[in-house]
């Protein structure tokens, strides 16, 4: 570890974490592990999942707080304004947290933690994993109500691609100097190629993702029949579930493709490699992406990727050898797929083992963690504004939602004052010192 950085006590906060599976969940898990390896103290704060409540230690030693918050929609908690203050304050004090790192625009818990932590004069960092538009109602509400106000008082912001950075700066009207770009990574040891299947299996195209409009499920419905009509032996494997699955089932029925299009449904993450190893080509039809983890996983397994040219995807993999990019137009994607199939059958695709080795060098979690700790250092070194200064920033963003955020901030300030009166931070610090001393003595006796 760079001795000039930290060590810091860090709380990674998001509604999305294990046992749930997804890009944000994976990112937090591996980032936490690598930060611990670098010498930092890390805890994760999320909401309870079924019977998983309270404090849990994962197999890698990571401490996780599963707090009893109400889940409102799609895994995100219902913002309660004052209800989360006692819980988050207690965890921040108990763990001597210096830096709060929130993840995901969609996580109400992350935004609450950033606001409460900021008013406690703790340092704050936010990672935006999403890419939004500017015109539709949901994007306007997210940009105005969440990003413009929630991030105005955050010390440092991380985006997963340069396209995502530009998008976030514009959406949130942020100072570009406090927004950095650090790409995602994958645990390449979990995504290794199977050369025997790659060469012996019939030509197989794999799609893994949620079957929703945003992921281009409508494009899939048009692409598959056209490719199957022009190439009589190609197979498709589709892993994932969602509202568009019915349309894909109808397409398969209409064109009598039951034996050539396999629908796997929802796929546990530990089975992703097994499915990828059955194919040689991976198709991604997303209409918008900040950084597409699935195409990196596919490339790590040795597959050639055919993808839409949207968002931050052109930054992810080298074009031609690793990925073929086309606009999200059915005929263009069909043409790209047919060219990839021709390359596969003539033995002109890159060797899967060499591709895996190259991806391993491009994307690894230790590198992401080292770059992230530099952002933490910037956050710690940046001046922490007073509570009055924070309220002024909300007001300057616009009087409408500004008054709403000022009101919420004042309620939180009063709530913190009452809690500090009955449970002083100094008393908590003494308890933490005694607890640390007890652990040290126990370790010495052993």
Please annotate each region the language model reported.
Residues 48, 163, 185:
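Carbohydrate-associated surface elements
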Residues 249-267:
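Nucleotide-activated donor-binding/catalytic signature segment of Leloir-type glycosyltransferases, i.e.
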Residues 348-405:
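A charged, aromatic-enriched C-terminal amphipathic alpha-helix characteristic of glycosyltransferases
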Residues 158, 197-225, 237:
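Conserved donor-binding/catalytic core segment of Leloir-type glycosyltransferases
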Residues 287:
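Aromatic "clamp/platform" in nucleotide-sugar-dependent glycosyltransferases that forms part
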Residues 266-267, 274-279:
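Short alpha-helical donor nucleotide-sugar binding micro-motif in glycosyltransferases
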Residues 304-307:
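Short hydrophobic beta-strand element within catalytic cores of glycosyltransferases
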């Amino acid at each position: 570890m760079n001795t000039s950085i930290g060590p810091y006590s860090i709380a990674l906060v998001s509604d999305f974490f294990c046992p749930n599976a997804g890009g944000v969940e994976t990112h937090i898990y591996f980032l936490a592990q690598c930060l611990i390896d670098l010498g930092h103290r890390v805890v994760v704060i999320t909401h309870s999942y079924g019977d998983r409540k309270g404090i849990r230690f994962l197999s890698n030693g990571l401490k996780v707080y599963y707090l009893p918050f109400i889940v409102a929609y799609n895994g995100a908690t219902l913002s309660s304004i004052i209800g989360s203050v006692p819980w988050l304050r207690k965890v921040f004090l108990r763990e001597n947290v210096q830096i709060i790192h929130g993840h995901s625009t969609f996580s109400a818990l992350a935004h609450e933690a950033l606001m409460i932590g900021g008013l406690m004069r703790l340092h704050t960092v936010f990672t935006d994993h999403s890419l939004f538009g500017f015109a539709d109602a949901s994007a306007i509400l997210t940009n105005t109500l969440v990003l413009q106000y929630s991030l105005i008082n955050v010390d440092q912001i991380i985006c997963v691609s340069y396209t995502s950075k530009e998008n976030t700066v514009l959406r949130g009207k942020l100072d570009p100097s406090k927004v950095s770009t650090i790409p995602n990574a994958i645990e390449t040891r979990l995504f290794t190629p199977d050369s025997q299947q790659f060469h012996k299996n019939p030509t197989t195209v794999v799609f893994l993702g949620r079957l929703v409009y945003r992921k281009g499920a409508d494009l899939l419905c048009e692409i598959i029949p056209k490719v199957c009509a022009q190439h009589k032996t190609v197979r498709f494997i589709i892993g994932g579930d969602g509202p568009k699955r019915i349309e894909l089932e109808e397409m398969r029925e209409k064109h009598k493709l039951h034996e050539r299009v396999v629908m796997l449904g929802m796929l546990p993450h530990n089975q992703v490699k097994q499915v990828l190893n059955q194919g040689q080509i991976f198709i991604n039809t997303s209409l918008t992406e900040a950084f597409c983890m699935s195409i990196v996983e596919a490339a790590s397994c040795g597959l050639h990727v055919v993808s839409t040219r949207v968002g931050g995807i052109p930054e992810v993999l080298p074009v031609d050898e690793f990925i073929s990019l086309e606009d999200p137009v059915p005929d263009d994607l069909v043409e790209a797929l047919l060219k990839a199939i021709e390359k596969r059958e003539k033995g002109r695709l890159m060797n899967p083992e060499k591709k895996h080795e190259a991806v391993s060098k491009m994307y690894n979690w230790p590198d992401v963690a080292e770059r992230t700790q530099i952002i933490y250092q910037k956050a710690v070194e940046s001046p922490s504004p007073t509570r009055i200064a924070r309220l002024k920033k909300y007001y300057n963003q616009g009087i409408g939602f500004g008054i709403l955020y000022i009101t919420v901030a004042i309620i939180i300030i009063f709530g913190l004052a009452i809690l500090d009166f009955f449970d002083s931070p100094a008393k908590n610090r003494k308890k933490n010192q005694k607890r640390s001393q007890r652990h040290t003595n126990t370790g010495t006796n052993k």
